[in-house]
């Protein structure tokens, strides 16, 4: 084959690679953004939405270690909501985008798990039912998983690359801009006041100034060893954001460190002899991870002044970002202290198994809905350790197994924690397919291709079923105390009667049920929506929402004179809500309150 033919073949391979990457990214994007509001917000999403609403409207958020997790979710979502509005689609989009970027980031591992391996891993991540489901949730998990992959890719590139690439420069610039964005918005709002045009004008001006400063910082970094330290600084930034996102960061980081040590030990103990190693090195292989060793990492750190500077810079980046977010951009000093206290609180929380599924919960859930990934990742781990050749594949396998074991041992279990180990499992599964397809054995090649196709088909169906059909079905593995789809019908009815009253969003709504999340989010624009969590005397409210069964007797006693019963709606498993409206607003189908426990007639409603 002459040089022209070689060049043509390379171009063809490059074209196939680019088209494949674009197609997989398109699938990931479609699955994460299509019908994003089809399922109502979960209880936790509603609480996160409440924190974000306060930050959006009042510019105030104070980190409290007793309230959910870290502050990053709210500040990242703030940028989205300022541009696209405080809407359900917007807040979920601010999470979904990181689900897509996880898939994109996987393409950069092609040197370490093979081209076919990285494409397959990315496809599995794009199609994983759990990855898609949690990407469509306004919670911390997906950004957390993205950061964990960001740490790995950054460190690998720091060891293996000599010069910073364009995308790493772009990511560094983005991190710097994000760090300053809330301050920009705050200053713009303060100077612009109630004038929207002025707010946008000041915001644009501040943004331009910050962009110039960021460009100067990037230029300075590029003059330092061709920008190679950028990768380590990115790893430090991702690590800091990881801890500022969720307390489980120490489990992820600890598992990664243990995995690195175990890979080194395994290769030392079970190192193949020189003849077999030479044969393995000469076999067809597009994986080039030979540089991923400690001496090369130590060399990349440099010595003398360079070593001191890169160490100090990494520590400063880590501390600055952590303090920045936990202190609510230097406005809440107690938040930094709370970041440390959070681990004592999390230790108590982690000692309870709310799902009552025992230590095998994740294996059970995984085999129910992520079986292709679980099985192929096990095969990939086996291949990696039998070969003892591909360091990154061994690391990914141990990373996956370590997290799986850690979360299985810890009593506290929720389905969304599983995606932390589904990520490295997809990498190991992709590696398994790569090794089979790259084999000289035609039967093994065919088997690898068939397994990839079967896995893709199974995952595609399960993803569709979970995310677009049975998204609130408690029999599904990832559905955990989720809000029932009937809840959206309740919100529609509240809006209908509020409009019918002529008062619209000024209508008075009394929520006396002790269970009401995520209703706070959906009624955020109703100025007189009150959440009492207990029965109160009401005389002038247009609408009342009460808890069925538990409050029925007292509801009938207190509200029968002025209110009628409309319908009962499921909030979540075991919790139903009754909708009452003032008699002058009620339709002909409304009932007296003493009749609200009568059986539903066929065709009468939900």
Task: Describe the role of every protein-language-model region.
Residues 346-349, 445-507, 512-527, 572-605:
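Membrane-proximal, lumen/periplasm-facing interface regions of secretory-pathway glyco-
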Residues 62-65, 505-509, 531-534:
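Surface-exposed patches in mature extracellular/periplasmic domains of secreted proteins
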Residues 2-446, 463-466:
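Membrane-integral, polyisoprenol-dependent glycosyltransferases
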Residues 523-538:
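A short, well-structured beta->alpha microelement
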Residues 130-131, 240, 403-404, 515-516, ...:
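Solvent-exposed loop/turn segments at secondary-structure junctions
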Residues 509-513, 531, 544-546:
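Short, hydrophobic beta-strand segments that form beta-sheet elements in well-ordered domains
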Residues 324, 536-595:
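Periplasmic/luminal catalytic loop of GT-C fold multi-pass membrane glycosyltransferases
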Residues 312-316, 498-505, 535-540:
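Flexible, charged surface loops at secondary-structure boundaries
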